[in-house]
């Protein structure tokens, strides 16, 4: 019986040489159904079976980051494994050296935390990493420390940092300056309209700015960082990662995975097996983040508005409901401190913004959505940091990812969501700690539209959010509210 030979094909793929029967076993093991694929037009039209196959029997290739899973599967099936010399693990890295290097970067008020050193050490040991660390844990410092290290070890190669939005390009650049570095000397900001070529060693870019470029462009990079890398499941970002054929150091950071097995395995394949550095609950307990209080307000709608609806119809009703929107406005106006209202649909955001503006003259109301320019968003952020009772009406897409306002005292979920990524990122917006802000209140608006003893769609989504809160060890209370017509 022929054994199985594992070879590093390049920095993206592992090649598995084995008998056809073993290849079929591997193909079956690494084939997964995409969640909710049955609703996709390509599946409904029978153009695709809704499955993702991570191993190709034809080429024998699989993402290099999945090596631990390949090794475990083959061993459990009793196959003898031979490793090519390209897969010999690097020598152990002394953690004392890591700690000494990281501590040398401390300047001013910056104090490095132990879990940050652990995360940095994990990456330096293997050259790859998928760092799972929540909002407020200092992911940007972890990236910064690794950038500083790799600048010393990469001779003629540059470093690529990929972020989801132009706002986060500016934020990362600003964070590096806050850490006492000189990004204007070392970093090139790349987004719409920017020159794609530079002599600087570090390129900070949105994925939209570079995903169409060819492999030749990406050959200049020896290290890549992808911040908020849960977006790497998007085809464009996966395309970027697979063009970095000879990029040795590959690091992804994210606040959360979305809970699906295929999502996790794709990310781990592109980077490495994930390491959870810390949790929001631990950061709150250790006083690195504000105390979180979750108030789940379950609105009981009047009988005449309860009838069977399809999901889009239910969402449309909730976003347009005058009684519901009026309740949200009144709630926001009774809260002390800066308040963020998050909603999904622009029409609802516009309605809430107009109603709030009409009902108050002595509080600043800001409206932020996808069309709001990055410079305007940054201007709003600066104003709110100096305010005590501002109200921001914003879309989930914009504010759940990357606008960093520390002085947020209250968050209102005005639209029902069940995405673990969006929920946790949105909560993270309010957990930043400041001298005069140690508490954050989340008001999760849920809707009881049960009809004929059958739960409505968004009430089921609320149950999903409760599950997330429980898994994250958040304290929450459920308060029933009768909604007047």
Regions found by a protein language model. Give the residues of each.
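Conserved pre-motif I regulatory segment
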Residues: 51, 84-132
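Walker A/P-loop
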Residues: 126-149
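Conserved helicase ATPase core of P-loop NTP-dependent helicases/translocases
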Residues: 170, 186-198, 350-351, 363-400
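Conserved helix/coil segment N-terminal to the catalytic DExD/H
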Residues: 192-223, 234-239, 398
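A short beta-strand element within the Helicase C-terminal
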Residues: 221-222, 394, 401-416, 425, ...
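Post-DEXD/H (motif II) to motif III coupling segment of the RecA-like Helicase ATP-binding lobe
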Residues: 230-293, 469
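Conserved interdomain hinge at the start of the Helicase C-terminal
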Residues: 306-344, 350-358
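Conserved segment of the helicase C-terminal RecA-like domain
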Residues: 429-463
């Amino acid at each position: 019986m022929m054994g199985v030979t594992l070879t590093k094909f390049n920095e993206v793929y592992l090649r598995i040489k084995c008998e056809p029967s073993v290849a079929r076993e591997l193909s079956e093991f690494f084939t997964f159904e995409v969640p909710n694929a049955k609703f996709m037009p390509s599946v409904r039209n029978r153009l695709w079976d809704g499955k993702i196959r991570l191993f190709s029997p034809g080429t024998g290739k699989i993402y290099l980051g999945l090596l631990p899973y390949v090794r475990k599967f083959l061993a459990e099936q009793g196959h003898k494994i031979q490793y090519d010399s390209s897969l010999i693990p690097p020598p152990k890295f002394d953690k004392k050296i890591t700690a000494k290097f990281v501590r040398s970067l401390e300047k001013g008020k910056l104090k490095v935390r132990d879990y940050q050193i652990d995360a940095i050490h994990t990456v330096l040991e293997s050259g790859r990493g998928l760092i799972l660390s929540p909002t407020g844990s200092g992911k940007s410092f972890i990236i910064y420390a690794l950038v500083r290290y790799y600048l010393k070890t990469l001779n003629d190669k540059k470093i690529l940092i990929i972020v989801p939005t132009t706002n986060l390009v500016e934020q990362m650049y600003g964070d590096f300056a806050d850490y006492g570095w000189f990004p204007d000397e070392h970093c090139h900001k790349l987004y719409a309209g920017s020159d794609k070529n530079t002599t600087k060693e570090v390129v900070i870019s949105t994925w939209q700015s570079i995903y169409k470029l060819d492999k030749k462009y990406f050959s200049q990079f020896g290290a890549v960082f992808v911040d908020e890398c849960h977006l790497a499941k998007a085809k464009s970002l996966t395309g970027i990662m697979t063009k970095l054929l000879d990029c040795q150091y590959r690091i992804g950071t994210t606040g959360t995975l979305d809970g699906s097995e295929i999502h996790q395995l794709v990310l781990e394949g592109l980077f490495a097996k994930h390491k959870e550095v810390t949790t929001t609950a631990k950061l709150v307990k250790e006083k690195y983040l504000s105390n979180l209080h979750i108030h789940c307000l379950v609105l009981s709608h009047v009988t005449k508005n309860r009838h069977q609806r399809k999901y889009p119809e239910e969402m449309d009703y909730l976003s347009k409901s005058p009684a519901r929107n009026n309740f949200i406005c009144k709630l926001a106006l009774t809260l002390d401190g800066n308040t963020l209202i998050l909603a999904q649909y622009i029409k609802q955001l516009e309605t809430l913004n107009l109603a709030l503006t009409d009902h108050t003259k002595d509080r600043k109301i800001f409206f932020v959505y996808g069309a709001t320019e990055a410079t305007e968003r940054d201007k709003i952020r600066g104003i709110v940091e100096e305010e005590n009772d501002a109200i921001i009406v914003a879309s989930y897409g914009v504010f759940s990812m990357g606008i960093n306002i520390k002085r947020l005292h209250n968050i209102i979920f005005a639209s029902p969501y069940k995405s673990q990524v969006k929920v946790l990122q949105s909560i993270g917006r309010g957990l930043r700690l400041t001298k005069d802000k140690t508490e954050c209140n989340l008001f999760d608006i849920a809707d009881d539209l049960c009809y004929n003893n059958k739960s409505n769609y968004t009430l089921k989504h609320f149950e999903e959010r409760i599950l997330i809160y429980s898994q994250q060890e958040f304290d929450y209370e459920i308060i029933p509210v009768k909604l007047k017509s």
